[in-house]
C-alpha cells in the first residue's frame, strides 16, 4: 500500500503523467482506477486532483504584482507553517529568478494547502516544480527547478 499522502499522489502523477508535455485529464476514470489499483485511497486521490485543479485555476487569475524594490513579508500564519528554512528557500529561488512574484505566491498558496503534510523544503521543491510546470511561460525556470529537485532525489523519494 502506498503512503497515504496527497504529495505522494501528486509526485506519482507528475513523474508518470505530467512530464513530456502530456496533458492530464483530471476527470478521467481510467486515471482514478489506476491510482486506486496502486493502493492510493480514493479520498487522498480526490484531494490530490482537487489540489491540481486549484493550481490550474489559480494560475490564470490576474495578480497585482509588487513594486520592483518591494520585499515579501510573511504573515504570522505563513510563518507558523513555513519555517525559516522554507522562507529562505523561497527567497533564494526568487533571487535566482526561478520564481517571480506571481509564481512565488502560487507556490506559497499551494504549499499552504498541503500544510497537513508538514511543510518542509522537500515539499516546497515539489510544489514549486508543479507550479512551474503549470505555467507555460516559465520553461527556463522549470528546467532549473527540475535539476534542483532531481539532484536531491537521486536516491529516491522519502
Swiss-Prot record:
Pfam families: DUF494 (PF04361). It comes from the Bacteria. HAMAP family: Smg. Belongs to the Smg family. This is Protein Smg homolog. It comes from Coxiella burnetii (strain RSA 493 / Nine Mile phase I). The gene is smg.
